[in-house]
Regions:
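Mg2+-dependent endonuclease catalytic cores in nucleic-acid-processing enzymes, primarily RNase H-like
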Residues: 132-262, 319-329
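Non-catalytic, compositionally simple segments
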Residues: 1-110, 236, 240
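Gly/Thr-rich phosphate-binding beta-strand-loop-beta motif of the actin/hexokinase/Hsp70
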Residues: 103-133
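Phosphate/oxyanion-binding active-site loops and adjacent basic polyanion-contact surfaces
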Residues: 106-107, 123-124, 145-156, 223, ...
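Short, flexible loop/turn elements at secondary-structure junctions
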Residues: 42, 54, 59, 114-118, ...
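Short, solvent-exposed helix-loop connector elements
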Residues: 260-276
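Acidic two-metal-ion nuclease catalytic site recognized across multiple nuclease folds
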Residues: 280-282, 287-329
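Acidic active-site catalytic centers that drive phospho-/nucleotidyl reactions
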Residues: 113, 176, 281-284
Length: 329
Protein backbone atom coordinates (compact mmCIF):
# COMPACT_ATOMS: atom_id res chain seq x y z
CA UNK A 1 0.00 0.00 0.00
CA UNK A 2 1.36 3.42 -0.99
CA UNK A 3 1.29 6.27 1.52
CA UNK A 4 1.20 9.82 0.16
CA UNK A 5 3.46 12.40 1.84
CA UNK A 6 1.88 14.46 4.66
CA UNK A 7 0.00 17.50 3.39
CA UNK A 8 -0.08 16.22 -0.22
CA UNK A 9 -2.39 18.30 -2.42
CA UNK A 10 -4.70 15.89 -4.20
CA UNK A 11 -6.38 16.64 -7.53
CA UNK A 12 -9.95 15.39 -7.23
CA UNK A 13 -10.92 14.58 -10.82
CA UNK A 14 -12.12 10.96 -10.40
CA UNK A 15 -8.97 9.60 -12.07
CA UNK A 16 -6.33 7.24 -10.73
CA UNK A 17 -3.39 9.45 -9.80
CA UNK A 18 0.04 9.22 -8.19
CA UNK A 19 2.83 11.71 -7.36
CA UNK A 20 4.56 10.65 -10.61
CA UNK A 21 1.36 11.21 -12.61
CA UNK A 22 0.85 14.62 -10.99
CA UNK A 23 4.45 15.62 -11.78
CA UNK A 24 3.98 14.64 -15.43
CA UNK A 25 0.79 16.72 -15.65
CA UNK A 26 2.55 19.74 -14.11
CA UNK A 27 5.16 19.68 -16.87
CA UNK A 28 2.66 21.54 -19.03
CA UNK A 29 1.79 18.68 -21.38
CA UNK A 30 -1.26 19.32 -23.60
CA UNK A 31 -4.45 17.59 -22.45
CA UNK A 32 -4.56 15.40 -25.56
CA UNK A 33 -1.05 14.10 -24.79
CA UNK A 34 -2.00 13.40 -21.17
CA UNK A 35 -5.00 11.44 -22.43
CA UNK A 36 -2.99 9.63 -25.10
CA UNK A 37 0.34 8.97 -23.35
CA UNK A 38 -0.55 8.78 -19.64
CA UNK A 39 -4.17 7.62 -19.59
CA UNK A 40 -3.82 5.46 -22.74
CA UNK A 41 -7.13 6.96 -23.83
CA UNK A 42 -6.91 7.70 -27.53
CA UNK A 43 -10.57 8.66 -27.72
CA UNK A 44 -10.04 11.26 -24.99
CA UNK A 45 -7.21 12.82 -26.93
CA UNK A 46 -9.76 14.31 -29.37
CA UNK A 47 -8.93 15.74 -32.80
CA UNK A 48 -7.93 19.32 -32.06
CA UNK A 49 -4.26 19.78 -31.21
CA UNK A 50 -4.61 22.82 -28.94
CA UNK A 51 -7.23 22.60 -26.18
CA UNK A 52 -10.13 25.02 -26.93
CA UNK A 53 -10.65 25.82 -23.24
CA UNK A 54 -6.99 26.71 -22.78
CA UNK A 55 -7.04 28.89 -25.90
CA UNK A 56 -10.01 30.78 -24.46
CA UNK A 57 -8.00 31.43 -21.30
CA UNK A 58 -5.00 32.56 -23.35
CA UNK A 59 -7.18 35.12 -25.13
CA UNK A 60 -7.53 36.81 -21.75
CA UNK A 61 -3.85 37.75 -21.99
CA UNK A 62 -4.17 39.20 -25.49
CA UNK A 63 -4.12 42.96 -26.03
CA UNK A 64 -4.79 45.48 -28.76
CA UNK A 65 -1.48 46.64 -30.24
CA UNK A 66 0.16 49.75 -28.83
CA UNK A 67 1.16 50.91 -32.32
CA UNK A 68 0.40 49.89 -35.91
CA UNK A 69 2.46 50.79 -38.96
CA UNK A 70 5.62 49.71 -40.78
CA UNK A 71 9.40 50.04 -40.62
CA UNK A 72 11.23 52.50 -42.83
CA UNK A 73 14.88 51.81 -43.70
CA UNK A 74 17.72 52.72 -46.03
CA UNK A 75 19.46 50.38 -48.45
CA UNK A 76 22.13 49.25 -45.98
CA UNK A 77 19.75 48.99 -42.98
CA UNK A 78 21.84 51.59 -41.15
CA UNK A 79 18.82 53.77 -40.40
CA UNK A 80 15.69 51.86 -39.42
CA UNK A 81 12.67 53.59 -37.89
CA UNK A 82 8.99 52.94 -37.19
CA UNK A 83 6.35 54.84 -39.16
CA UNK A 84 2.90 54.78 -37.58
CA UNK A 85 0.01 54.15 -39.98
CA UNK A 86 -3.50 52.77 -39.57
CA UNK A 87 -3.82 49.29 -41.06
CA UNK A 88 -0.06 48.83 -41.50
CA UNK A 89 1.37 45.30 -41.61
CA UNK A 90 3.42 45.70 -38.42
CA UNK A 91 1.80 45.70 -34.98
CA UNK A 92 3.71 46.47 -31.79
CA UNK A 93 2.83 45.42 -28.23
CA UNK A 94 5.79 47.32 -26.80
CA UNK A 95 6.49 50.97 -26.18
CA UNK A 96 9.27 52.76 -28.03
CA UNK A 97 11.89 54.91 -26.34
CA UNK A 98 12.18 58.70 -26.88
CA UNK A 99 14.13 58.18 -30.11
CA UNK A 100 11.56 55.71 -31.45
CA UNK A 101 13.33 52.39 -30.80
CA UNK A 102 12.42 49.27 -28.78
CA UNK A 103 14.08 48.65 -25.42
CA UNK A 104 17.86 48.25 -25.63
CA UNK A 105 17.88 46.37 -22.31
CA UNK A 106 16.59 43.19 -23.94
CA UNK A 107 17.48 40.89 -26.81
CA UNK A 108 15.01 39.62 -29.38
CA UNK A 109 14.30 36.77 -31.80
CA UNK A 110 12.10 36.69 -34.90
CA UNK A 111 10.23 33.66 -36.21
CA UNK A 112 9.21 33.70 -39.88
CA UNK A 113 6.62 31.72 -41.82
CA UNK A 114 6.88 32.47 -45.53
CA UNK A 115 4.06 32.31 -48.07
CA UNK A 116 4.31 32.74 -51.84
CA UNK A 117 3.15 36.36 -51.63
CA UNK A 118 0.58 35.91 -54.39
CA UNK A 119 -2.17 38.29 -53.32
CA UNK A 120 -5.68 36.99 -53.73
CA UNK A 121 -8.81 35.82 -51.97
CA UNK A 122 -7.22 32.55 -50.82
CA UNK A 123 -3.70 33.88 -50.25
CA UNK A 124 -1.86 32.90 -47.11
CA UNK A 125 -0.09 35.42 -44.91
CA UNK A 126 3.65 35.71 -44.55
CA UNK A 127 4.30 36.38 -40.87
CA UNK A 128 7.19 37.64 -38.75
CA UNK A 129 6.80 37.15 -34.99
CA UNK A 130 9.08 39.07 -32.60
CA UNK A 131 9.68 37.82 -29.05
CA UNK A 132 11.73 39.19 -26.16
CA UNK A 133 14.40 36.65 -25.24
CA UNK A 134 14.32 37.92 -21.66
CA UNK A 135 10.61 37.94 -20.81
CA UNK A 136 9.23 35.55 -23.45
CA UNK A 137 6.64 38.17 -24.42
CA UNK A 138 5.62 38.57 -28.05
CA UNK A 139 6.26 42.24 -28.77
CA UNK A 140 5.55 42.55 -32.50
CA UNK A 141 3.90 40.85 -35.46
CA UNK A 142 4.24 41.53 -39.18
CA UNK A 143 1.57 39.94 -41.42
CA UNK A 144 1.09 40.43 -45.16
CA UNK A 145 -0.53 38.29 -47.87
CA UNK A 146 1.06 40.05 -50.85
CA UNK A 147 4.76 40.18 -49.93
CA UNK A 148 7.00 37.88 -52.05
CA UNK A 149 9.66 35.84 -50.18
CA UNK A 150 12.56 38.03 -51.32
CA UNK A 151 10.80 41.21 -50.20
CA UNK A 152 9.85 39.54 -46.92
CA UNK A 153 13.55 38.78 -46.43
CA UNK A 154 14.30 42.50 -46.78
CA UNK A 155 11.55 43.34 -44.28
CA UNK A 156 12.83 40.64 -41.90
CA UNK A 157 16.41 41.92 -41.93
CA UNK A 158 15.15 45.48 -41.36
CA UNK A 159 13.05 44.25 -38.44
CA UNK A 160 16.07 42.36 -37.05
CA UNK A 161 18.02 45.63 -37.12
CA UNK A 162 15.13 47.53 -35.54
CA UNK A 163 14.92 44.97 -32.72
CA UNK A 164 18.67 44.62 -32.30
CA UNK A 165 18.42 45.15 -28.54
CA UNK A 166 21.84 45.16 -26.87
CA UNK A 167 23.58 43.62 -29.88
CA UNK A 168 25.36 45.45 -32.68
CA UNK A 169 24.13 43.06 -35.39
CA UNK A 170 20.43 42.43 -34.76
CA UNK A 171 17.79 39.96 -33.62
CA UNK A 172 18.15 36.18 -33.93
CA UNK A 173 16.20 34.99 -37.00
CA UNK A 174 14.56 31.58 -37.50
CA UNK A 175 12.32 30.63 -40.43
CA UNK A 176 10.58 27.64 -42.01
CA UNK A 177 12.84 26.58 -44.87
CA UNK A 178 10.29 24.53 -46.82
CA UNK A 179 8.94 25.81 -50.16
CA UNK A 180 9.30 29.61 -50.49
CA UNK A 181 11.58 29.53 -47.44
CA UNK A 182 14.48 28.65 -49.74
CA UNK A 183 14.16 31.96 -51.64
CA UNK A 184 13.82 33.78 -48.32
CA UNK A 185 16.99 32.13 -46.99
CA UNK A 186 19.02 32.96 -50.08
CA UNK A 187 18.04 36.62 -49.92
CA UNK A 188 18.68 36.90 -46.16
CA UNK A 189 22.08 35.21 -46.16
CA UNK A 190 23.49 35.93 -49.61
CA UNK A 191 21.97 39.20 -50.78
CA UNK A 192 21.74 40.93 -47.39
CA UNK A 193 24.53 38.91 -45.71
CA UNK A 194 22.61 38.53 -42.45
CA UNK A 195 24.09 35.67 -40.42
CA UNK A 196 22.55 35.77 -36.92
CA UNK A 197 20.27 32.89 -37.88
CA UNK A 198 19.08 29.51 -36.64
CA UNK A 199 20.81 26.32 -37.78
CA UNK A 200 18.62 23.23 -37.57
CA UNK A 201 19.38 20.37 -35.24
CA UNK A 202 18.86 16.64 -35.69
CA UNK A 203 15.62 15.83 -33.84
CA UNK A 204 16.52 12.13 -33.95
CA UNK A 205 19.91 12.59 -32.26
CA UNK A 206 19.83 12.49 -28.45
CA UNK A 207 22.16 15.51 -28.25
CA UNK A 208 20.27 17.36 -31.02
CA UNK A 209 23.51 18.11 -32.85
CA UNK A 210 23.47 21.40 -34.77
CA UNK A 211 23.82 21.00 -38.55
CA UNK A 212 25.26 23.33 -41.18
CA UNK A 213 21.81 23.89 -42.68
CA UNK A 214 20.16 27.22 -41.81
CA UNK A 215 16.44 27.41 -41.12
CA UNK A 216 13.94 25.00 -39.58
CA UNK A 217 12.63 22.25 -41.88
CA UNK A 218 9.11 20.92 -41.43
CA UNK A 219 8.32 17.19 -41.47
CA UNK A 220 5.54 15.29 -39.69
CA UNK A 221 7.90 14.62 -36.79
CA UNK A 222 9.56 18.04 -36.51
CA UNK A 223 6.17 19.79 -36.81
CA UNK A 224 4.75 17.69 -33.97
CA UNK A 225 7.79 18.45 -31.80
CA UNK A 226 7.69 22.18 -32.61
CA UNK A 227 3.97 22.63 -31.90
CA UNK A 228 4.17 20.53 -28.73
CA UNK A 229 6.99 22.77 -27.46
CA UNK A 230 4.95 25.83 -28.41
CA UNK A 231 1.87 24.51 -26.59
CA UNK A 232 3.93 23.99 -23.44
CA UNK A 233 5.36 27.50 -23.82
CA UNK A 234 1.86 29.00 -24.01
CA UNK A 235 0.55 26.89 -21.13
CA UNK A 236 3.42 27.69 -18.75
CA UNK A 237 3.67 31.37 -19.68
CA UNK A 238 7.20 31.01 -21.05
CA UNK A 239 5.81 32.36 -24.33
CA UNK A 240 3.33 35.18 -23.76
CA UNK A 241 1.26 35.78 -26.89
CA UNK A 242 -0.52 39.15 -27.11
CA UNK A 243 -2.09 38.62 -30.55
CA UNK A 244 -5.80 37.65 -30.63
CA UNK A 245 -5.53 36.36 -34.21
CA UNK A 246 -2.47 34.26 -33.43
CA UNK A 247 -4.11 32.55 -30.44
CA UNK A 248 -7.35 31.93 -32.34
CA UNK A 249 -5.47 30.39 -35.28
CA UNK A 250 -4.19 27.69 -32.91
CA UNK A 251 -7.74 26.32 -32.80
CA UNK A 252 -7.57 25.32 -36.47
CA UNK A 253 -4.88 22.66 -35.94
CA UNK A 254 -6.20 19.09 -35.87
CA UNK A 255 -4.91 15.55 -35.94
CA UNK A 256 -5.46 13.82 -39.28
CA UNK A 257 -3.55 10.74 -38.12
CA UNK A 258 -2.07 9.51 -34.83
CA UNK A 259 0.98 11.80 -35.15
CA UNK A 260 0.17 14.02 -38.13
CA UNK A 261 -1.05 17.57 -37.54
CA UNK A 262 -2.57 19.81 -40.18
CA UNK A 263 -4.27 23.16 -40.31
CA UNK A 264 -7.90 23.20 -41.38
CA UNK A 265 -8.19 25.88 -44.06
CA UNK A 266 -11.07 28.05 -42.89
CA UNK A 267 -12.43 30.82 -45.07
CA UNK A 268 -13.45 33.89 -43.15
CA UNK A 269 -13.03 37.61 -42.71
CA UNK A 270 -11.50 37.74 -39.25
CA UNK A 271 -8.08 38.49 -40.68
CA UNK A 272 -7.60 42.27 -40.88
CA UNK A 273 -4.74 41.94 -43.38
CA UNK A 274 -7.12 40.72 -46.09
CA UNK A 275 -6.15 37.06 -46.45
CA UNK A 276 -9.45 35.25 -46.83
CA UNK A 277 -8.00 31.86 -45.97
CA UNK A 278 -5.91 31.39 -42.83
CA UNK A 279 -3.27 28.68 -43.13
CA UNK A 280 -1.90 28.79 -39.60
CA UNK A 281 0.97 31.05 -40.62
CA UNK A 282 0.94 33.03 -37.36
CA UNK A 283 1.07 29.79 -35.39
CA UNK A 284 4.20 28.52 -37.13
CA UNK A 285 5.93 31.92 -36.88
CA UNK A 286 5.09 32.09 -33.16
CA UNK A 287 6.19 28.48 -32.60
CA UNK A 288 9.53 29.24 -34.27
CA UNK A 289 9.96 32.35 -32.12
CA UNK A 290 9.21 30.15 -29.10
CA UNK A 291 11.88 27.67 -30.28
CA UNK A 292 14.37 30.54 -30.36
CA UNK A 293 13.84 31.11 -26.62
CA UNK A 294 15.79 27.94 -25.89
CA UNK A 295 17.91 27.58 -29.01
CA UNK A 296 19.41 31.00 -29.66
CA UNK A 297 23.16 31.69 -29.33
CA UNK A 298 24.33 31.89 -25.73
CA UNK A 299 24.50 35.49 -24.54
CA UNK A 300 25.38 36.99 -21.18
CA UNK A 301 21.94 38.02 -20.02
CA UNK A 302 22.44 38.20 -16.25
CA UNK A 303 22.34 41.99 -15.97
CA UNK A 304 19.50 42.28 -18.46
CA UNK A 305 17.47 39.62 -16.68
CA UNK A 306 17.93 41.31 -13.34
CA UNK A 307 16.64 44.59 -14.75
CA UNK A 308 13.74 43.10 -16.72
CA UNK A 309 12.63 40.57 -14.12
CA UNK A 310 12.07 43.34 -11.57
CA UNK A 311 8.84 44.07 -13.43
CA UNK A 312 7.97 41.06 -15.64
CA UNK A 313 4.87 41.05 -17.91
CA UNK A 314 1.60 40.03 -16.17
CA UNK A 315 0.76 36.36 -16.68
CA UNK A 316 4.28 35.44 -17.76
CA UNK A 317 6.36 32.55 -16.47
CA UNK A 318 8.80 35.11 -15.05
CA UNK A 319 6.05 36.79 -13.03
CA UNK A 320 4.90 33.49 -11.51
CA UNK A 321 8.49 32.53 -10.69
CA UNK A 322 9.04 35.91 -9.03
CA UNK A 323 5.86 35.44 -6.95
CA UNK A 324 7.04 32.00 -5.82
CA UNK A 325 10.42 33.43 -4.83
CA UNK A 326 8.73 36.16 -2.78
CA UNK A 327 6.54 33.58 -1.00
CA UNK A 328 9.64 31.63 0.07
CA UNK A 329 11.21 34.66 1.77
Amino acid sequence: EYHFPPGYRFTLDQKYRSPWYDRECKRGLPKHLIAQELDIDFGGSGRTFFDPGELKQLEGGCRNPVLTGAVSFDEGFQEVSFIESKGGPLRLWCNLDPIGLPSREEDYAIGADIATGLAGKSASNSVLSVVSLVTGEKVAEYASHDTPPTELARQAVALCKFFRGRTTFGAFLIWEDNGPGASFRKAVMEEYEYTNVYYRRSEEHALKVKSKSPGWYSTEKTKLILLTEYGIGLRTGKFLNRSFEAVRECGFYVYVDSNKIEHVKVRGTMDPTGAGENHGDRVIADALACRALKDRPTLKLEETKAASMSNPPPGSYAQRRRERDLEKR
